Design a protein with these regions (language model features):
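Residues marking helix boundaries in flexible regions
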Residues: 23, 34, 216, 233-235
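Blade/loop signatures of beta-propeller domains
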Residues: 49-79
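Extracytoplasmic beta-rich repeat domains
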Residues: 52, 62, 80-95, 105, ...
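Beta-propeller domains
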Residues: 104-113
Length: 395
């Protein structure tokens, strides 16, 4: 069955791009006007959990909350696997009935969410590491370890454009209107046009930009390898404020209700007040002193992330420990949350389902190889890749 005819009714609306802009790529035309937002002193950040039918970028949404509204079955079973030719560290994107994922072989692959059949493969020319695809208006964007940012036709896998951005890219693209925000190891955060890849502006930091930017109120937020958390205005690339994290950060910030949450390599999780522009609290496990590489998932009651201490940590929004769950190896996968359950991979080769309330294990699946990629959730299904090149779908 072809890509057009396999789209579910639920995903048809989200995928109406497949019947438009095939011959002329012009994402999100705004009549030449780029809408900017006023930075309010009260700084409201209204979390918008990911719609049930889509997981269109890393962490699901602009705020990087890692939370889906999808109704996932209480009892999971493996539905299909796809064998890539190399490791999968990239986290998948799901739009309607289509899955997009990058591989270390340098391929961006589009698959059928229902059965895992391949629609197309795009050759990036360089390995794809942790950069995860982002979909917008008929195009899929992804970075590679050669420093290239690619725009690919979501229907047929043909290249719209590609552009070199200084150095290797492990950050994931985030599409905001007709602009793409993405970090590079050349120490810059880039703002690039979706139409042709031209650089609109770039912001210089003092270290590699590994973090994927979170977006709220017209600002891009990055937690940096230079130990600084920054708010950058998307309209012109100017820094609005910064906060010292006190340590190197490899994780991306999750934004919710005026706060940003992320872990550091100084073994801490930080809660940063965006209104006060200061660290509101710091969490550190009392015994196990290991870095946090996993990006947090955030709900109205919990901050959940993995640690290199082999634990999944569940915190209250005030930074107090609510629970921990022990795995057998580092947890570098970033958790996803749906329906009161936490979904996360571990380098012990297992995919875990935990209670959001108390961290109790509800289910596990042994993949037999490290799972450092993060789950994507949409249409009642969960997709995650492994270090041995297998892409799993559960439902």
């Amino acid at each position: 069955m072809g890509l057009l005819t396999s789209v579910s009714r639920k995903g048809a609306k989200a995928l109406r791009f497949f019947s438009k802009r095939i011959s002329s790529f012009a994402p999100l035309r705004l009549g030449g006007i780029f809408l900017t937002f006023v930075f309010l002193l009260t700084f409201p950040v209204h979390a918008q959990d990911t719609p049930a039918e889509n997981w269109a970028q890393f962490r699901g949404n602009h705020q990087l909350t890692g939370v889906s509204l999808s109704n996932v079955p209480a009892t999971l079973k493996p539905l299909w696997t796809y064998q890539a030719d190399d490791a999968i560290e990239s986290s998948a994107a799901i739009v309607g009935s289509t899955v997009f994922v990058g591989t270390a072989k340098g391929e961006l692959v589009a698959l059928n969410l229902d059965n895992g059949s391949v629609y197309w493969k795009y050759d990036a020319g360089n390995p794809i590491g942790e950069s995860s695809p982002a979909y917008s208006d008929g195009a899929v964007f992804i970075g590679d370890l050669g420093g290239m940012l690619h725009a690919v036709n979501a229907r047929d896998g043909k290249r719209f454009w590609s552009v070199k951005l200084g150095s290797e890219i492990k950050s994931s693209p985030v599409v905001y209107g007709d602009r793409i925000l993405i970090g590079s190891y050349d120490e810059h955060l880039y703002c690039v046009s979706t139409r042709n890849g031209s650089v609109i502006w770039k912001f210089k930091t003092n270290g590699p930009v590994h973090s994927t930017p979170g977006i709220a109120s017209g600002l891009a937020f990055i937690a940096g390898c230079d130990e600084v958390f920054r708010a950058i205005r998307i309209s012109d690339g100017k820094e609005v404020f910064n906060v010292s994290s006190g340590a190197y950060t490899g994780a991306s910030p999750a934004l919710r209700a005026g706060m940003a949450y992320y872990g550091t390599f100084d073994n801490e999780v930080l809660g940063v007040s965006l209104e006060k522009k200061e660290v509101a609290w710091r969490y550190e496990h009392p015994q196990r002193k290991f870095p946090f590489y996993s990006s947090a998932a955030v709900t109205a009651s919990r901050v959940v992330l993995g640690g290199r201490d082999k634990l999944v940590h569940g915190l209250s929004l005030n930074g107090k420990a609510a629970w921990t769950f022990a795995t057998r190896a580092r947890v570098e996968s970033s958790p996803a949350i749906a329906g009161g359950r936490v979904y996360v991979g571990s380098n012990d080769g297992r995919f875990y389902v935990l209670s959001l309330t108390n961290g109790a294990k509800l289910w596990e699946f042994n993949a037999g190889a490290p799972l450092s990629a993060s789950p994507a959730i949409a249409n009642g299904k969960i997709v995650i890749g492994s270090q041995d090149g297998r892409l799993y779908c559960f439902g």
